[in-house]
């Protein structure tokens, strides 16, 4: 299995071998253009990472951890005097009720994470194993 993200298209693709299983519409950070460089920049990282863990008690329904920062990210941030940040996830919507959930659909609202709806994060939770590669493109 693998995940491929196209930030500019707001799409995430789930593959099994080379077979496309599903395409997801996604939301990104409030500052979506460019690679994440430091904590608080609200950017979604770009590059090759992996799913490195999961949180069943997420504030966003469920969440899958992305292995950001990698060594390159840490070196680049340190060279510029910054913390690279962390806690980049694929997650669902905030644990709110009713009409508030509609606010988060079809807009960028995260702090750099990749968001899908709650039904989709449940699908991904069951389909994607820890160690699955995720390639995040511009």
Summary of predicted features, one role per range:
Residues 16-18, 36, 41, 82, ...:
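Short, functionally important structural connectors and interaction interfaces within domains
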Residues 53-138:
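Exported/periplasmic cell-wall-interacting domains
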Residues 6-8, 45, 60:
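Short, basic and Ser/Thr-rich N-terminal targeting/leader segments
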Residues 1, 28-52, 71-76, 99, ...:
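N-terminal post-signal-peptidase region of extra-cytosolic proteins
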Residues 23-25, 48, 87, 133:
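Well-ordered beta-strand positions in beta-sheet-rich domains
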Residues 1-34, 138:
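Intrinsically disordered, low-complexity
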């Amino acid at each position: 299995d693998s995940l491929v993200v196209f930030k500019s298209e707001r799409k995430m693709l789930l593959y099994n071998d080379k077979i496309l299983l599903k395409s997801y519409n996604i939301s990104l950070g409030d500052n979506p253009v460019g690679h994440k460089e430091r904590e608080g920049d609200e950017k979604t990282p770009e590059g090759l990472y992996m799913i490195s863990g999961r949180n069943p008690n997420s504030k966003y329904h469920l969440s899958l951890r992305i292995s950001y920062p990698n060594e390159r990210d840490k070196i680049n941030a340190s060279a510029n005097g910054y913390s690279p940040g962390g806690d980049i996830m694929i997650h669902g919507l905030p644990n709110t009720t009713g009409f508030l959930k509609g606010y988060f659909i079809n807009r960028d609202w995260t702090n750099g994470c990749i968001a899908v709806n709650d039904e989709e994060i449940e699908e991904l939770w069951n389909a994607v194993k820890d160690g699955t590669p995720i390639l995040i493109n511009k």
